[in-house]
A protein has these predicted regions:
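Conserved nucleotide-cofactor-binding alpha/beta core module
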Residues: 1-89
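Non-catalytic C-terminal accessory region of glycerolipid acyltransferases
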Residues: 14-16, 39-43, 75-168
């Protein structure tokens, strides 16, 4: 059982002819969002590195793919990401990882952190709204989750003072 909170603008965006960017972090059950959307008929695509164990990598990829959640290889998948965006698909990212020296430096809990620029750039280039979400188990019961859409950013509605990738 999954309850979706604050999802009205997200489900409205699914009906538009635009790609969507989902952002979450390594918090709660970050896998349930892609699983749920795939079951509802909205396949999601995520960028990740291959697992070190090729047998486990194949098992996890096959399992995700059966429910409509597909992994694009972080090292070789640029064209695949472009294709998803051009076909108005859903890209999902775990955005709580350091982008290293080339990232956009932002404040995170008052401390400087290096964030990936790609999500903001793709949002602007492909007119894709960004939705920040997370899922947690509810009432400490198995297979009982709440998925929360916490924030939404639509590039069509950016205020004029937003001018940089860091601000997005």
């Amino acid at each position: 059982h999954v309850t979706i909170e604050n999802g009205r603008s997200f489900f409205k965006a699914l009906q538009e002819d635009r790609p969507i960017i989902l952002i979450t972090g390594h918090f709660g059950n970050f896998e349930i969002g892609g699983f749920l959307l795939g079951l509802l008929g909205y396949p999601t695509f995520s960028v990740a590195r291959k697992l070190d164990n090729p047998y486990l990598d194949r098992f996890v990829s096959d399992f995700r793919g059966r429910t409509g959640q597909f992994i694009i290889d972080k090292n070789t998948g640029y064209e695949d990401v472009v294709s998803v965006m051009e076909k108005r698909g859903i890209m999902a990212f775990l955005a709580d990882q350091s982008a290293g020296k080339k990232g956009a430096w932002v404040k995170f809990f008052g401390r400087p952190a290096s964030a990936y620029k790609a999500m903001a750039l793709m949002s602007l280039q492909y007119d894709a709204p960004i939705f920040v979400c997370y899922a947690t188990r509810r009432d400490n019961k198995p297979l009982n989750f709440t998925m929360r859409m916490v924030e939404a950013l639509d590039p069509r509605a950016l205020p004029p003072e937003i001018k940089t990738v860091q601000q997005i």
